[in-house]
Structure formats: C-alpha cells, structure tokens
C-alpha cells in the first residue's frame, strides 16, 4: 500500500488504537484480546487500526482487514524514547506486513545514539517502500522528521514530554500548525470525547487516531468512578 492509498483508506474516518500493556487488565501473555477489540472497532466503522507488538498485529490481521499502524513499545532506560526506538523493532515489525510503522521522532537522546534523521534514513535505505509515521510532541520534531523522510507526522506524544505543553486535551494548536504547513498529519493524543474529535475533524488532518477513550476499559471506568471521589 502506498501513501496515497493509505490516506484514501483512512481519511474521513477514525483509526482506533487497540493496545494493552503488561500490568493492564486486558493484557495476557498469549494475546487474543486485542483482535476482539479490533473486530469491535471494525464493526463500529473504524477505517484503520493502531496496534502494539508483533503478536497483536499478526493476531489482528487474521480477523480484521483494515490498514494498520504498527508499533513496538520497548524500554531502553535511561533513554526515554520507547515507541519503535531502534532498528531491532523495525525489523520485527517488517515481518508482520503492517502498512505503516510508527516510531518515536522526538529530539530526546536515543538508545542507539543516532539522530532522528539518521534513524529515518537508515530505515528508508533498508526498507524503501515502507510507510513511516513520526510520533512527535511539538512542531520542531514533526518538521524535522518530515524533512528526514517520514510519510506522516503524528501528534501522539504532545503532552507526554518535557518539550510539549501539559494539557488533558488534544493539542489543537499543534495539529492546526502542522496542517497549515502542508504536512500529512495523523492527529493523535488525548482525544477523550466526540466533541473534541469534531474539533480535530474541522482542522482536516490526513488521519485521526483515538485509543484509550475507546479501548481501555480501566481508563474509561475511572472517568465514572472518579465522580464519587469529588
């Protein structure tokens, strides 16, 4: 799938992120839960999916036929980047046939010692036809990654790094600035409500991802139980 085909598939609809990490209620060693989430997302009308780990991506692809953004979350302390942070994770994801690979493109120190531009160029040299998405937290990071060769820039990490504003809502200003600059934007991060989604739609990015507000029942339940604590 090329870039234009991917945009045609996901634009005007919703990419739903289906993830569960160790320690979360929906995580199991053998998997099997995220494919059910993905089926529910597809039945609800999702136009794409975002998933974590080779296991989950392969299991989802067996039951759902939607374009997918794939990542591997792996910590390399003390460095902070953990979303597809090295070529090892890229190599593993390539075995899944996932349509887009997303990777941390913040300007924080990396485990492999490379710059973001060096990492992107290395991936593109090894896998020239693979679509890449930059997970970033601010305008500078997104612009840097796009100029280095990624196909899409995401606002995934805005609000989660020291280099971005701390808010509990989508970074509308960042999404708009990137769209206005002509970049192919996948808006993601802190979209908690349909009203916030509508605001993002009005900015008209190439794609939009919603995750926790749909597929993390612990997070969803807490929004209700916390009412009793106020």
Swiss-Prot record:
The keyword RNA-binding does not apply. Converts N-acetylmannosamine-6-phosphate (ManNAc-6-P) to N-acetylglucosamine-6-phosphate (GlcNAc-6-P). Belongs to the NanE family. The gene is nanE. It catalyses: an N-acyl-D-glucosamine 6-phosphate = an N-acyl-D-mannosamine 6-phosphate. GO terms for biological process: carbohydrate metabolic process; N-acetylmannosamine catabolic process; N-acetylneuraminate catabolic process. Its EC number is 5.1.3.9. Pathway: Amino-sugar metabolism; N-acetylneuraminate degradation; D-fructose 6-phosphate from N-acetylneuraminate: step 3/5. GO terms for molecular function: N-acylglucosamine-6-phosphate 2-epimerase activity. GO terms for cellular component: cytosol. It comes from the Bacteria. The keyword Isomerase applies. This is Putative N-acetylmannosamine-6-phosphate 2-epimerase. NCBIfam families: PRK01130.1. Keywords: Carbohydrate metabolism, Isomerase.
